[in-house]
Design a protein with these regions (language model features):
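Conserved active-site "lid/cap" helical segment
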Residues: 1-20, 24-34, 38, 45, ...
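Glycine- and Gly-Pro-enriched alpha-helical subdomains that act as flexible
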Residues: 206-244
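Active-site-proximal alpha-helical scaffold in enzymes
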Residues: 49-80, 116-145, 202-209
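Conserved catalytic cysteine-centered active-site region
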Residues: 15, 19-74, 103-109, 169-195
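Short acidic, glycine/serine/threonine-rich loops at helix termini
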Residues: 27-28, 85-91, 233-235
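Beta-strand segments within the central parallel beta-sheet cores of soluble alpha/beta enzyme folds
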Residues: 9-18, 45-50, 75-81, 125-132, ...
């Protein structure tokens, strides 16, 4: 909204927020709370969707589907995750014994180890990829490629978060010295695993007519959506059959 000041917030009809663990500080219908804090009028509805890693993408799916069906013309799809405040699995996980027997509650790191074994992906290959990834991210920040995407966040006057803290200058010697993070004989370490992060993002989605009438820059067009399931032990492969 800050980048599109010509938009009247009263035009926003719905806000759908993706969140993998909507409890604790992320609970109590966080989508509506986000809308209120953003100054969006009370006429805007709010809903939280949980599809774990695909939660925010599902928010995009739902808003775009509402627009395509003619239910609304303008909505916000957003996502948030505070992995510092809400632990993996939530505060009081209660595992179903039959699901536990089927390894339904397997962690993401362990699923990645399964895929690495399937694909014969070595630790060295993962570390090489990680180094390249960090270098690309650092270069992108240096070249201000995220200048129009990242908005500084004021932490209650104590500090100002202006950039992603994840990318760092790779230290290959330190990377090679790390112990496996998930399996004793595994290949994935803290240097090649997903970080524990806090982050949020949001996009404005409108009908083409609405965008043209309000002189909004169209950055992308949603042509279709697809979801599909995979063996939960191979969850990292989910996007592949969905894309196909």
């Amino acid at each position: 909204l800050k980048r599109n000041e010509n938009i009247n917030p009263s035009q926003i009809e719905d806000l759908i927020l993706g969140c993998a663990f909507p409890e604790g500080p992320q609970g109590m219908l966080m989508a509506k709370g986000v809308a209120i804090l953003a100054g969006v009028p009370e006429t805007c509805a709010g809903a939280v969707v949980n599809r774990f890693c695909g939660s925010s993408m599902d928010a995009v799916h739902q808003i775009s589907t509402k627009i395509e069906s003619g239910d609304i013309q303008f909505g916000i799809a957003a996502g948030v995750e505070d992995m510092f405040s809400v632990p993996m699995g939530g505060f009081n996980p209660d595992f179903h014994p039959e699901l536990a027997e089927q390894e339904y509650y397997i962690g993401m790191g362990e699923t990645a180890e399964i895929l690495a074994k399937e694909g014969n992906i070595t630790r060295e290959q993962q570390e090489e990829f990680s180094v390249k990834s960090h270098n690309k991210a650092l270069r992108a920040w240096e070249e201000n490629n995220f200048a129009n995407e990242v908005i500084p966040v004021d932490m209650y006057g104590e500090s100002l978060v202006e950039k992603d803290e994840g990318p760092r200058e790779p230290d290959l010697e330190k990377i090679r010295s790390l112990d496996p993070a998930f399996l004793e004989s595994g290949t994935i370490t803290a240097a090649t695993a997903s970080p524990i992060s806090i982050g949020a993002a949001a996009v404005l989605i409108t009908s083409r007519d609405f965008a043209e009438q309000n002189k909004l820059k169209i950055r992308a067009t949603i042509k279709g959506r697809a979801v599909t399931g995979v063996d939960w032990r191979r969850m990292g492969m989910g996007p592949l059959p969905a894309t196909e």
